[in-house]
From Swiss-Prot:
Residues 1-24 form the signal peptide. The lineage of its organism: Eukaryota, Sar, Alveolata, Apicomplexa, Aconoidasida. This is Plasmepsin VII. It is an enzyme of class 3 (hydrolase). GO terms for cellular component: cytoplasm. Keywords: Aspartyl protease, Cytoplasm, Hydrolase, Protease, Signal, Zymogen. InterPro entries: Aspartic_peptidase_A1, Pepsin-like_dom, PEPTIDASE_A1, Peptidase_aspartic_dom_sf. It is found in: Cytoplasm. The gene is PMVII. High doses of antibodies against PMVII partially reduce infectivity in A.stephensi mosquito.
Amino acid sequence: MNKNIIQIYLFVFILLLKQHIVILKNEEFTNPYSIRKKDIKAIVNVNNKLKSINIHKLDNINKKDLLGSYNENYILIKLKKQDIFSKKLSTYYGEVQIGEQSENNMNVLFDTGSSQVWILNDTCKNSLCNNIHSKYKRTKSFVYKYDKKGLPSVIEIFYLSGKIVAFEGYDTIYLGKKLKIPHTNISFATKVDIPILEEFKWDGIIGLGFQNGDSIKRGIKPFLDILKDDKILTNKNYKNQFGYYLSDKEGYITLGGIDNRLKNTPDEEIIWTPVSTEMGYWTIQIMGIRKEYVNNHFEENKEEEEVIVKYEAFHDGGKNSIIDTGTYLIYAPKNTMENYLKDLKINNCDEKYNLPHLIFQIKSDEIKTIKGSAIIEIVLTPNDYVIEYVDKKNNTKECILGIQPDEQSEEDNVDGWTLGQVFLKAYYTIFDKDNLKIGFVRSKRNVTLR
């Protein structure tokens, strides 16, 4: 073996020995249209690293995470970013092909806040199905879905921002231009009454959520269940998981595995939290949140240090929180925003440096060697949660908070936090379907993959 290769492996092995998982011991303590749910606001610049909090060390390092061979262990789906400056709005979408011969190229929103798959049909003629959109043309591989009376199934899908009317059927979907998902249940929209869609460039939604009451009633299988039950990923030696990465200009989904180049540092450990699927969302338990004031002017140049964190935290009373790739902002429980975070305000970009770090205390993946509840801590800096954008009218830089109170918690059945794309730009997030858990690791800024 080449001497240089031996040295590289030795260096990687040393890094593995030095790694540790960060956790904190705590003894005290649906209808989906995501961009819909909340007002989406513009463009975020993300930087700063995850603060290392060392309370306990574990030795079971997953070497595959470190030594995995990038594009060989996942399917890459590139996400394009669309900014609508007049509305301080941004969205990310990716391309899929539909039809056995890939006849239809469509742009879709990949939405963990939904279990529905729908696209615009070529019979949709109202103004919201305008010329910026691609529309599905029926293929030879299309099959109708029939209702109990033997008639083609027609449905209405209601969202907080409106509704769509669609007929149901089946066709083949290709992801990353090479992963084939045959006989996928799709709703083909013939009428759209969601005004905000008119300016978006995506043509439909691929829901990456779980089964809910609606999907059970309609007898449809969520997209992720198709991938798992039909062994579409595992038959090709991929995992039933996907990573979600966003940058200032674009993003990526790594379907079937992870890419360490998207981490802040390649050997940085992923920290995991268990997931509940009862509501159809990727639901996690946020146990509390606290503020930490630091000198943000110098934070980027500081060496990271291990910090012992106090056990106590503000408990916001809303544990069930969701990770939603289809929502742009972060939404806090209204009571939390009006009380504990009431001083979280910004009038100009200079005031960003006076804002605190926000530290989320999240239930950890079960670790049997620790007594009590294991808690992981996720840090958001002002650079993470303050949105910067350019006012085109005055050509000035403006700043707004990327965290807003959740005024719609009753409608979407979420009593805790909704962590949208503002959060996801700070953390490369791994959604593990097999083990029902989510992993977080600080993102490296503005990575470009080929």
